[in-house]
């Protein structure tokens, strides 16, 4: 497990790891427990996410709607979802934005993406400075990753309203409603891997976990 690069200077950033989802596809495949707590090399999946994000931000916390005691070993604040009639990842995003609101910018990631770029924050901040957009999302292999993004924390009222009235309660559709820019991140390489891999590769299925272990072993070589 390798740490990220030093955080970019000139902007205060709060980071949030959103540990949502039910891990249902993983459990249906015979793997019990939370997908982000599965072992990946010498540490759980989420520990790799922490190691890559923490050096890029000023403060970092974990968000979840479940039992927060699961995260006690990681030494980070854990914030439970705001109680709302709606559910899903947008509530997690709202919780993170509200918790980070003393800071101007929030960097988010899922808890099951262990190979995040070590220069993710600097690339997203650069795009935000160039465009002035309130939402910057990561993109790789022609696919936008709505959970991985840089958000202006003044979006809280917009998101609260969206959750009240919107029919499409997804992060992507909220971002599309507000307007967003993307940063295209190239596929990554490891010397012992025959093929490149997506730095936003996420773990949903048992086969994904096996692939993640293969990538991790190659990165540690």
Swiss-Prot record:
What is the recorded function of this protein according to its Swiss-Prot or TrEMBL entry? Transfers a GMP moiety from GTP to Mo-molybdopterin (Mo-MPT) cofactor (Moco or molybdenum cofactor) to form Mo-molybdopterin guanine dinucleotide (Mo-MGD) cofactor.
Query: Which CDD domains does UniProt cross-reference here?
Result: MobA
- UniProt cross-references to InterPro entries, sorted A to Z: MobA-like_NTP_Trfase (IPR025877), Molybde_CF_guanTrfase (IPR013482), Nucleotide-diphossugar_trans (IPR029044)
One GO MF annotation is:
molybdenum cofactor guanylyltransferase activity
- Quote the subcellular location field of this record: Cytoplasm
Instruction: Please give the organism.
Output: Brucella melitensis biotype 2 (strain ATCC 23457)
* Native organism taxonomy: Bacteria, Pseudomonadati, Pseudomonadota, Alphaproteobacteria, Hyphomicrobiales
Q: What class of enzyme is it?
A: transferase
Pfam families referenced in this protein's UniProt entry, alphabetically: NTP_transf_3 (PF12804)
Subunit info here reads: Monomer.
Residues bound to Mg(2+): 112
The UniProt entry lists the main location of this chain as cytoplasm
Q: What is its EC number?
A: 2.7.7.77
Name of this protein: Molybdenum cofactor guanylyltransferase
Q: Which GO terms describe its biological process?
A: bis(molybdopterin guanine dinucleotide)molybdenum biosynthetic process
Record has Magnesium as a keyword: yes
Which co-factor is required?
Mg(2+)
Record keywords, A-Z: Cytoplasm, GTP-binding, Magnesium, Metal-binding, Molybdenum cofactor biosynthesis, Nucleotide-binding, Transferase
- List the HAMAP family: MobA
The record's comment about this protein's domains reads:
The N-terminal domain determines nucleotide recognition and specific binding, while the C-terminal domain determines the specific binding to the target protein.
The entry marks the following residues as binding GTP, namely 18-20, 35, 63, 81, 112
* Family of the protein in this entry: Belongs to the MobA family.
Q: Which residues form a coiled coil?
A: none
> Has the keyword GTP-binding been applied to this entry?
yes
Q: Give the reactions, separated by semicolons, that this protein catalyses.
A: Mo-molybdopterin + GTP + H(+) = Mo-molybdopterin guanine dinucleotide + diphosphate
Q: Name one GO cellular component term.
A: cytoplasm
């Amino acid at each position: 497990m390798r740490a990220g690069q030093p955080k970019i200077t000139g902007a205060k950033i709060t980071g949030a790891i959103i540990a949502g989802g039910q891990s249902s596809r993983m459990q249906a495949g015979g793997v019990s427990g939370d997908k982000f707590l599965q072992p990946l090399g010498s540490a759980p999946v989420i520990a790799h996410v922490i190691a890559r994000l923490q050096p890029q931000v000023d403060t970092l916390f974990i968000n979840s709607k479940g039992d927060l005691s699961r995260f006690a070993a990681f030494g980070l604040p854990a914030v439970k979802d705001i109680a709302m009639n709606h559910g899903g990842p947008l509530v997690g995003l709202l919780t993170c934005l509200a918790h980070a609101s003393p800071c101007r910018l929030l960097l988010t990631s899922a808890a099951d993406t262990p190979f995040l770029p070590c220069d993710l924050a600097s690339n997203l901040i650069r795009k935000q400075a160039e465009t002035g957009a309130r939402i910057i999302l990561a993109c790789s292999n022609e696919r936008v990753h709505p959970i991985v993004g840089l958000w202006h924390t003044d979006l809280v009222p917009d998101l609260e309203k969206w959750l009240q009235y919107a029919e499409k309660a997804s992060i992507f559709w909220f971002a599309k409603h507000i307007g967003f820019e993307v940063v295209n991140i190239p596929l990554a390489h490891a010397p012992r891997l025959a093929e490149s891999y997506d730095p936003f590769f996420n773990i949903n299925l048992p086969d994904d976990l096996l692939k993640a272990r293969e990538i991790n072993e190659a990165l540690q070589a």
